[in-house]
Regions:
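Double-stranded beta-helix
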Residues: 137-207
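Non-heme Fe(II)-dependent double-stranded beta-helix
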Residues: 1-13, 19-112, 118-119
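Short, conserved beta-strand element in jelly-roll/cupin
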Residues: 113, 120-137, 191-194, 199, ...
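A generic structural micro-feature
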Residues: 53, 119-122, 214-218
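Short, charged/polar surface micro-motifs in flexible loops or helix N-caps
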Residues: 79, 89, 104-107, 133-137, ...
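Short, surface-exposed loop/helix-turn segments at secondary-structure junctions
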Residues: 112-114, 173-184, 213-218, 237-242
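Histidine-centered catalytic micro-motifs
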Residues: 109-117, 143-144, 205-208, 224-227
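Non-heme Fe(II)/2-oxoglutarate
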Residues: 44-49, 156-159, 194-199, 203-270
Length: 270
């Protein structure tokens, strides 16, 4: 499924689009899982709908221990192999499952950001982004090509109001004003159909393409974050203390490789 050319493209650009890579069985389980979570939200359910808005923008993460549908996807689908092959890893752990729902009419979406500053992991990581409905370019994601190779971490913006978190440390710089200087960057985006997926590096800058416009139809996306064999747990600071404390309570040691039942090993070369 994954050619050498695709691996080279992923390593160079920080993102690839895989066509017809996810069988319908796994997509159906994802839809069922989201429906279940919406009826019975868990500890990590978040509602970023602006005050007074009638259309919701919600998401939830680390749902799989209470959602058998997501556990099945994580343990038995080809996602782990896809992630491991593109990252050129010896083995991979699934570090977080996550779904998003942006209802028709919702006028907010993810601003320019990359994932690493939101999470307590360092090393080689990727995200597999899976649309559960067809997504034209304007309803998908836009990426800054090659931005994962800039060697820079950016302050994490909070999604609901696009207000930066207080990220301690000189290594975190403000996200550049990409829209105002678009001529300085090369952008990548795709129209994606059911069964397609996007795979991107933890440091690749991206945003929801039509984040400043109302969604024309309801959008459901499921994402899975994977860490390669060099990934370690590294608590970042106060803005991630809820999740880092949660993982430490489950036995994950700071500065150590992933070793926690919540983040299972899902694929290995041998």
């Amino acid at each position: 499924m994954i050619s050498e050319d695709l691996v080279e493209t992923y390593q160079r650009d920080g993102v690839v689009c895989l066509r017809d890579a996810i069988p319908e069985k796994w997509l159906a389980l994802g839809r069922e899982g989201i429906d279940q979570n919406l009826k019975n939200p868990g500890r990590f359910f978040r509602d970023h709908t602006p005050t007074g808005a009638s259309s919701r923008y919600v998401f939830e993460y680390w749902t799989w221990p209470q959602t058998p549908q997501f556990e099945d996807v994580i343990r038995n689908s080809p996602l782990g192999e896809i992630a491991g092959t593109l990252m050129q890893a010896n083995h991979v752990h699934m570090v977080m499952d996550n779904w998003f729902m942006r209802e028709a009419g919702a006028s907010n979406g993810a601003p320019w950001h990359h994932d690493e500053p939101y999470f307590d992991f360092e090393g080689t990581l990727c995200i597999i982004w899976i649309p559960l409905e067809r997504a034209p370019i304007e309803d998908g994601l836009t990426f800054v090509r090659g931005s994962h190779r800039w060697g820079q971490l950016y302050v994490a913006p909070e999604f609901s109001e696009n207000v930066p978190f207080v990220c301690e440390g000189s290594q975190y710089q403000p996200v550049p004003d990409i829209d105002a200087h678009s001529e300085d960057y090369e952008f990548l985006s795709w129209e994606v159909d059911v069964g397609d997926c996007l795979v991107f590096d933890f440091r690749t800058l991206h945003c929801v393409t039509n984040r400043d416009q109302s969604a024309q139809q309801s959008q459901r996306r499921m994402t899975f974050r994977f860490g390669a064999d060099d990934t370690v747990f590294s608590p970042r600071g106060r803005w991630t203390e809820e999740t880092s404390a949660y993982l430490m309570g489950l036995g994950q040691k700071p500065g150590s490789p992933i070793d926690c039942d919540l983040m299972p090993k899902v694929w290995a070369t041998a």
